[in-house]
């Protein structure tokens, strides 16, 4: 069992940080994690889709995980959990990455379904994959349903509910955006199974459906605004939550369209670090970066207001 509890809230799938030569920029990894720890979020995810996991080798994955844990501990966030993305094309590699994640300081793992040979893997074999990973993983597992990152493979609510009874599978992230699926899972899974929305543009809808919160890439840029939606909803101030949700949804659409490259560009514009991706991905041109900066300005204004309170 993990030492740090997974609680409802906003979790940030952090972007990976690189120097100009594309080496991992450990100092910026730690700087960003420390910044997020002070923003009210519930935890951090590394090696997710925003974290360029597919651009990292095994040693680099472990380096980023351990640096993130070190940064959180250094600012007193010793109880804040780190979730580590460990999806891989084979069951064997996924298990090895889960073991690595635990050894490097991870508390939970987030596992995409294997999709490279999607047509050769039956539904039964797919469920067996997740069960085998959960059996072998030294830390608890969250199922990551993101058709856009898994060749269109979209786990159904039946699939996820079938896996929810496994004692080492404790939740799911639904980046499919299907709130009906989310509601069905919440209603039928046990109370200890946490269901998270995978984008902050439907945070309020996730909460209304009974979800535990969101794991949202745009929270790299506007963590307090994302947290504020949950605070207002929990306080019964739904109309105010709707207004904040609208601003956050507009910002999230920019991130959805531009991917992690857009998120990194906004971080560079507003926090002075983070733009460099790994090839073949490239940073936006100066004109594109300026346009993104302007487009994110509405949500950044809200974020700064919340930060000053």
Swiss-Prot record:
What residues make up the catalytic site? 173
CDD domains per the UniProt record, alphabetical? DHDPS-like
Q: Which residues cross the membrane?
A: none
What is the protein name stated in its UniProt record?
A: Probable 4-hydroxy-2-oxoglutarate aldolase, mitochondrial
* Keyword vocabulary terms for this entry: Lyase, Schiff base, Stress response
Q: What class of enzyme is it?
A: lyase
Do you know which Gene3D superfamilies this protein is assigned to? Aldolase class I (3.20.20.70)
Name of a matching Pfam family: DHDPS
Protein's job: Catalyzes the final step in the metabolic pathway of hydroxyproline. Involved in osmoadaptation.
EC numbers on record: 4.1.3.16
What reaction does this catalyse?
(4S)-4-hydroxy-2-oxoglutarate = glyoxylate + pyruvate; (4R)-4-hydroxy-2-oxoglutarate = glyoxylate + pyruvate
Q: What induces it?
A: Down-regulated when grown with elevated levels of potassium chloride.
């Amino acid at each position: 069992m993990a030492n740090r509890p997974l609680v409802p809230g906003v979790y940030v799938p952090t972007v990976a940080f690189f120097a100009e030569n594309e080496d991992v920029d450990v100092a910026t990894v730690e700087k960003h994690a420390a910044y997020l720890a002070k923003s009210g979020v519930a935890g951090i995810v590394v090696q997710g889709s925003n974290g360029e996991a597919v651009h990292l080798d095994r040693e680099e994955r472990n380096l980023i995980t351990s640096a993130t844990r070190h940064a959180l501990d250094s600012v007193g966030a010793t109880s804040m959990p780190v979730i580590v993305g460990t999806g891989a094309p084979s069951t064997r590699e996924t298990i090895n990455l889960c073991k690595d994640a635990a050894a490097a300081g991870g508390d939970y793992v987030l596992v995409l379904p294997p999709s490279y040979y999607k047509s050769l893997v039956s539904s039964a074999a797919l469920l067996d994959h997740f069960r085998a990973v959960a059996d072998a993983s030294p830390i608890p597992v969250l199922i990551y349903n993101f058709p856009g990152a898994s060749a269109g493979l979209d786990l159904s609510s039946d699939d996820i509910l079938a896996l929810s009874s496994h004692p080492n599978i404790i939740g799911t992230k639904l980046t499919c955006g299907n709130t009906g699926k989310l509601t069905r899972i919440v209603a039928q899974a046990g109370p200890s199974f946490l269901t998270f929305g995978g984008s902050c543009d439907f945070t309020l809808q996730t909460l209304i459906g009974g979800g535990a919160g969101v794991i949202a890439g745009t929270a790299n840029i506007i963590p307090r605004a994302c947290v504020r939606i949950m605070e207002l909803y929990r306080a019964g101030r739904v109309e105010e939550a709707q207004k904040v949700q609208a601003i956050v949804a507009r910002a999230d659409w920019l991130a959805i369209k531009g991917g992690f490259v857009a998120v990194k560009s906004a971080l560079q514009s507003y926090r002075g670090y983070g733009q460099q991706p790994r090839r073949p991905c490239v940073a936006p041109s100066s004109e594109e970066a300026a346009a993104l900066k302007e487009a994110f300005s509405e949500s950044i204004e809200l974020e700064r207001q919340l930060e000053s309170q």
